[in-house]
């Protein structure tokens, strides 16, 4: 049974010692092996519940998305990964929670909504699974339900290079440049399910094409007086 985050005595934005330790190691590795560059992270709210939706290229994606942020990023993980007690402790320390793939896991949906409404930053891949060829897959319907129920800011993000670094056909990752771009929060208010899915699909594809073409978003404006 999953305990809703509202019952846990934790700071939604606090980076635990485990999180900080793992993040520093992963940042070093990502810089050395993947030349990781992250753009537009200022679009992600500093506090409060928010949903980050991204294309899904490889197992690297949840970690890659989290490395460019100043907040902890909560995410779903396959239930099989929680069978090993030590590894389960580690990924729970990194704000992961289990989901049964392909089973219409209502518990995972409820947990996602509870986390978002409880002030967490949550990552969801609306495609539902990793790409087979690097291209963006159709959006799954469940993400629209999550967005309509949670009523929190929705920040789009895209990743390139992660597929080349670790495609489904490889057992281990290889060196390849990876780029991440966060976009402006989407206005999905009063949209029905199909409109939400169409907006997400169009936004992610446009951002993905732009990033592959080398179109890097501008840096945020500097505060006055600096």
Question: Where are the regions a protein language model picked out?
Answer:
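Non-catalytic C-terminal accessory region of glycerolipid acyltransferases
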Residues: 2-17, 107-226
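Secondary-structure transition/capping residues
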Residues: 36, 40, 76, 89, ...
